[in-house]
Amino acid sequence: MKIINKGVEPNRLGVFRAANPDALWDKDKKDNELIGETFRCCGARYQETQQQLRTDQGNLCAYCEQDLLSGTNGALDDCRIEHFHPKSKREQGEPNWGLDWANLLVVCCGGNQSKVVAPEKRFDTDPENYSCDVLKGDKILDAIIFNPLNLPDANIWKFYRSTGLIDVNETVCEAQGLDVKMARRTIKELNLNSPRIMRARKAVLDNLNNLITEKLRSGQTIELARRSIAASVLRKNKAGDWPSFFSVTRFYLGQQAEGSLVQPL
């Protein structure tokens, strides 16, 4: 999870909310008597909102930072809109969470879609290995886990190349005034150490290690090797996408990575 800098609210979302302030996000499958239009009735409206979220997030899952793939040949996108505060949990006087732009994120499918693109890497047969919004469900975790919109620019995580495991960098976390226990709950509640995600992170770490090894063999110092790799990979591509598992690369390349990063992240 990294900081997300939100862009301007999509036009169709703003127009719909202004005209239908109490509208539901989607039709309740149990309620066949629903009267009125829901947000998801219009595919163009949903797609515009999802695309703006993908742009804002550099096409990374708001929780695990895996890249968001679009499906081809009938496969499902590994991408969907998530409500940080459950859209169904609205108390008297609260905003309509379903249509609140500040409450919307875009995430991967968390491993629970068998027809997702690249299922061999992105689908899990064991529900205990699901992650991100799947485990979060309708739980109100606003005061329990971090909201990526409120994170600092600093990387508060550390990773282990031998396993791909994510842990809390307590020193950085405390220096940023963040609650270490809340950071650990974030990992736990979103199951960010799902074996599926750990394998993907380990692959990124192994690739970085191989790149560094090649440069060391060519005579470069470790600092120069890390700096040149950071300049090459720690940036958005032409489509505006960050590299998958951005924080993993940032951590592994250390101080040399920080010198290559351009704000905002």
Regions found by a protein language model. Give the residues of each.
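Active-site cores of enzymes that catalyze phosphoryl transfer or operate on phosphate-rich substrates
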Residues: K2
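Short, charged surface segments at domain edges that flank catalytic/cofactor-binding sites
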Residues: K6-Y63, R90-E91, P95-L99
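Short, well-ordered loop/turn elements at secondary-structure boundaries
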Residues: T55-G58, D100-A102, L151-A154, Y160-R161
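A structural signal for short, well-ordered beta-strand segments and their strand-loop junctions
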Residues: A62-Y63, R80, V106-V107, I156-F159, ...
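Histidine-centered nuclease catalytic patch
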Residues: Q66-Y130
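C-terminal, charged low-complexity interaction regions
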Residues: D167-L265
